[in-house]
Amino acid sequence: MTTQKRLLSWTAACAATLLVGGVLLSACHTKAVLTSTAPTTRQHYLMALADAQRPDPSKVSNDLMPVSDDNKALEWTTVGDMKMVLVCKMIDQQTVPLFARPDTFRISTRSGYWVSLPADWARRADQFQGLDSVAARRRMVEMLGLWPECDYDMVATFYVDVSRLFRPAYDPTITTTTSPADFPAWVDENYTVGGGVNFRKWFADQQASAYQGRKACPWAQLGYSYDWHSNAPRQGISEYIATDKSVVLTKKVQGVWSFIKELTK
């Protein structure tokens, strides 16, 4: 076959392109190119980011996990006269040394630590059934409402002074199972939480920054993390803030996969 005939045959093959079942098939390519309009992982995240900025009564949860003596699922300890509750936080490798301490220490971060409760993860353990280590870590990122590129792969479990905790919601009370979609009358401009933090200012600062930048997060403002997985019902894990200078005591630092396997035993 002459060079000209080979070229004509190749051109004809390229023209013989078929669209079958939403998949573009071409003799010019060895791979099928998907033309599906289904949202991608990032699109699900971006939709959650937009939705989270519009809290309303229909999104209010009545199933937030309370931090109270009545909640028998919680783990407590006492250091001196300080009552401390067990919480956890997903972290990166660079943060591990901060928690590798045998004694109590004070955290130092202006906006506080966002934390959750191991007991709350335990009641959601079914979310990880059948997943391998990679998929399970990704699922935890989704459930916490973190950004898709987040590289956190460790979990620090530690006790924190319970008097320094508040809920990052319109009602910052930690002993209830719900928060409204607007500030209660008693949460005025002078209301403080967690050892003197002006709550309304903290809240306004978060509204101005949480949804912006490379690490933007869909903060629901209602006491739970925004689970942005495609088939999730929006409500992730109950979340709390440990304020700057809170006293903490590390219990364990482990990989995400080890943490999850303990939940699913």
Residue spans of the language-model regions?
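ADP-ribose/NAD+-binding catalytic cleft of ART/PARP-like enzymes
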Residues: 31-115
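Short active-site loop/helix that positions an aromatic residue
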Residues: 118-137
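Conserved NAD+-utilizing ADP-ribose enzyme module
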Residues: 141-265
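Short, flexible loop/turn elements at secondary-structure junctions
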Residues: 91, 114-121, 159-164
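Bacterial N-terminal signal peptides that target proteins for export
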Residues: 2-15
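N-terminal post-signal-peptidase region of extra-cytosolic proteins
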Residues: 101, 134-144
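Bacterial N-terminal signal peptides
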Residues: 13-23
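C-terminal motif of bacterial Sec signal peptides marking the signal peptidase cleavage site
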Residues: 25-27
